[in-house]
Amino acid sequence: MAKRRAAEPLTFRVPWKRLLLSDFPEEPPLWVPPSGTARPLKRQGDAGIMAEPASAPRKRRGGGDDRQELQGCSREPGEPPPGEQEEPRAAGGGDRVESAGSPQVADGVHSQQPEEFWQYNTFQYWRNPLPPLDLAALEDVSANSLTETLEDKNEGVEIDMES
């Protein structure tokens, strides 16, 4: 709102803009809703809609699969497209939840998601992997240095008390 109020004095100082604004008896609306079906402003909390969210899969302008779009952005230049790597999906896009008649397919899809998330997470995808740590070597070093540090502190305390 502040930007609109600040813009009004500027428009009234310019003569040709004053003429444009005088043609409208009222201020023109900032946004005109597109003509067509009226859409509700808020989602309805219908139990049927919440129980079957994938009965009508969402479509985008390209009409392609969402996973292919996401994976295509983060591929290496030499990698084949994801359609050649994956198993063929059922008709209907693949972002639908499978029916109760095929629990094996649904379990396979859910078990694959964390691996894909890790692989295509941009923060971790571009970072160098950490080298493997040998915890046994760390424990040996920390145990030796801890005992040496305790012995050194005790010697320092004895020297301070003598003087």
Swiss-Prot record:
Q: Report whether Heme shows up as a keyword of the record.
A: no
Q: Which residues carry this modification: Phosphoserine?
A: 102
Q: Any keyword Phosphoprotein?
A: yes
Which N-terminal stretch is annotated as signal sequence? none
Chain spans, region Disordered: 23-113
| Keyword annotations from UniProtKB, A to Z | Phosphoprotein
Q: What is this protein called?
A: Uncharacterized protein C9orf40 homolog
Q: Which organism is it from?
A: Mus musculus
